[in-house]
């Protein structure tokens, strides 16, 4: 007996699973607010130098730029030199008295003057946030395999709630960055644990649907953020508003059961049995749950129990050729997705469209994108869906290179299409990665994969600097990288209707089966029924 068959006995898709996914999904909905928060809390309004205290604003104080508007970072020296014939020869100086911002909304930019020579600090804040997610993926992936999925999830909720609230009350920019780093750290733990718990408690046939449902939670969160930002013009109150709900999620997470597979592999079979019986009662299958015994559980999952004695680290991801190839291809796909996604998602201001409207459009494109992803994952398979998403995104980004800047509508359409494809790529990757890695090292594999997408999201803003050399260079780099990631996905094995691998040895058997001609259809059908046939694919979860 496998876990999938045990799950069938206690209810593989009952009330418990729907409530379980709902409890995991609500935090994901609000997590989108944190990921994209800096679009609004770090918005840069039109600004110019504040005139000296003894001068009035005017063209004789503020030089005009090429666009006929006041220079943003320079002003004329005051008082003017009377011997100069006209203002064109007057000396200019930096904004010694600060700036005037033409906006009724405040942000970290207006509060700490992150403009002109300090404008790089704005990007640094986002990079620090992404660094927190990156480090969190490294640290929490291993801790989750050691101490369980639920404890890491619960602590991550509390960390995000506390650090997000702390950022709202930060007195200085350095302290704000520290709290943003901790926010990223917490988000990484939430993402990793949610993915694992979703996949391990949902039957195979429903994995794609339930995982994509979690993806929709993130999508709807993107709809909520523009409304919140419009209604709450003060960045501190906006930061606090999106952080407080995680205190509630921290409390509700105590209801979330631990992964049964993890409990068995950790030698806690008695606790696993209690949870299975509670799930059976919740799903209206109390008698089936009562018939399960500790001896039966240990006997039928003896293989998994014996694996608890083995210790696995990130180095084991490179132990066998197939695992090495998988890790390389997945790492490239994750890097390319994060690299290209955040180039579009955080570049909303570049398209000359109303910030709030464009953010809603960017979020809205995820709805059809994820629906198409569900169908594609279920019928075309994982590696085809993954490759197509990245290849199409790369093509759309490269096309931006050839569209003139004044054709803003065309550029916006291409960007929205590319963003939708990359969102689809994320949804597929979470599911695909969790299905490819064996149970004994799944969370570590997810952690390493998330590391690469965060590296991509950190490097992405730096590539924009190359636009100062030639405007088309950034999009060429983003587009080619996405194409490479899509090509790498073609070398990954298909997992549609395949059992979740429990051990590294299972992957070797996978490889051997793939090389053999289909001689024994009856045996193959039986093997497919073992862990997964009861159920199907999912999102970006475990």
Curated annotation (Swiss-Prot):
The chain crosses the membrane at residues 10-30, 124-144, 155-175, 177-197, 213-233, 237-257, 328-348, 355-375, 387-407, 412-432, 472-492. One of its GO terms (molecular function) is solute:inorganic anion antiporter activity. Residues 31-123, 176, 234-236, 349-354, 408-411, 493-542 are extracellular. Gene3D superfamilies: MFS general substrate transporter like domains. Coiled coil: none annotated. It is found in: Basolateral cell membrane. Its main location: membrane. SUPFAM superfamilies: MFS general substrate transporter. One of its GO terms (biological process) is transport across blood-brain barrier. Glycans are attached at residues 86, 102. The modification Phosphoserine is found at residue 4. It is a multi-pass membrane protein. Keywords: Cell membrane, Detoxification, Glycoprotein, Ion transport, Lipid transport, Membrane, Phosphoprotein, Transmembrane, Transmembrane helix, Transport. InterPro entries: MFS_dom, MFS_sugar_transport-like, MFS_trans_sf, Orgcat_transp/SVOP, Sugar_transporter_CS. NCBIfam families: 2A0119. Functions as an organic anion/dicarboxylate exchanger that couples organic anion uptake indirectly to the sodium gradient. Transports organic anions such as estrone 3-sulfate (E1S) and urate in exchange for dicarboxylates such as glutarate or ketoglutarate (2-oxoglutarate). Plays an important role in the excretion of endogenous and exogenous organic anions, especially from the kidney and the brain. E1S transport is pH- and chloride-dependent and may also involve E1S/cGMP exchange. This is Organic anion transporter 3.
């Amino acid at each position: 007996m496998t876990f999938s068959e045990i799950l069938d006995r206690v209810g593989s898709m009952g009330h418990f699973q729907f409530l379980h996914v709902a409890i995991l999904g609500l935090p994901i909905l609000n997590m989108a607010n944190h990921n994209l928060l800096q679009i609004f809390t770090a918005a840069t309004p039109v600004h110019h130098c504040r005139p000296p205290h003894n001068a009035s604003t005017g063209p004789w104080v503020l030089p005009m730029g090429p666009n006929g508007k006041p220079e943003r970072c320079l002003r004329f020296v005051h008082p003017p030199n009377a011997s100069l014939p006209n203002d064109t020869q007057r000396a200019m100086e930096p904004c010694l008295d600060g700036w005037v911002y033409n906006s009724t909304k405040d942000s970290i930019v207006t509060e700490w003057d992150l403009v002109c020579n300090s404008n790089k600090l704005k990007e640094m804040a986002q990079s620090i946030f992404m660094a927190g997610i990156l480090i969190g993926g490294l640290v929490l992936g291993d801790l989750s395999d050691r101490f369980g999925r639920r404890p890491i999830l619960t602590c991550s909720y509390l960390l995000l709630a506390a650090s997000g609230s702390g950022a709202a009350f930060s007195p200085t920019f350095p302290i704000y960055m520290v709290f943003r780093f901790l926010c990223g750290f917490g988000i990484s733990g939430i993402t990793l644990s949610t993915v694992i718990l979703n996949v391990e408690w949902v039957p195979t046939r429903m994995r794609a649907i339930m995982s994509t449902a979690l993806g929709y939670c993130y999508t709807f969160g993107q709809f909520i953020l523009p409304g919140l930002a419009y209604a709450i013009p003060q960045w501190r109150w906006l930061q606090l508003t999106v952080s407080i709900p995680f205190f509630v999620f921290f409390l509700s997470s105590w209801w979330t059961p631990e992964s049964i597979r993890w409990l068995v592999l950790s030698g806690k079979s008695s606790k696993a049995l209690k949870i299975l019986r509670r799930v059976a009662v919740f799903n209206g299958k109390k008698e089936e749950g009562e018939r399960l015994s500790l001896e039966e559980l240990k006997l039928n999952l003896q293989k998994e129990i014996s694996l608890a004695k083995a210790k696995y680290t990130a180095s084991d991801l490179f132990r066998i050729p197939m695992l090495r190839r998988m890790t390389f291809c997945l790492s490239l796909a994750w890097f390319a997705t994060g690299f290209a996604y955040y180039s579009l998602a955080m570049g909303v201001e570049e398209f000359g469209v109303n910030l709030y409207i464009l953010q809603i459009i960017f979020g809205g494109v995820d709805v059809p994108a994820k629906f198409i992803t569900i169908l594609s994952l279920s019928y075309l398979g994982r590696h085809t869906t993954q490759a197509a998403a990245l290849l199409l995104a790369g093509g759309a980004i490269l096309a931006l290179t050839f569209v003139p800047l004044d054709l803003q509508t065309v550029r916006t359409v291409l960007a929205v299409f590319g963003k939708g494809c990359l969102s689809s790529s994320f949804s597929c990757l979470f599911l695909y990665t969790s299905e490819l890695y064996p149970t004994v090292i799944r969370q570590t594999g997810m952690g390493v994969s998330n590391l690469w997408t965060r590296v991509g999201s950190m490097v992405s803003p730096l590539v924009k600097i190359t636009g100062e050399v030639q405007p088309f260079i950034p999009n060429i780099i983003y587009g080619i990288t996405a194409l490479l990631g899509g090509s790498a996905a073609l070398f990954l094995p298909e997992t549609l209707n395949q059992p979740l691998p429990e051990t590294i040895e299972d992957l070797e058997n996978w490889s051997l089966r793939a090389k053999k001609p289909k001689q024994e259809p009856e045996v193959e059908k039986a093997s497919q029924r073992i862990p997964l046939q009861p159920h199907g694919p999912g999102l970006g979860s475990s």
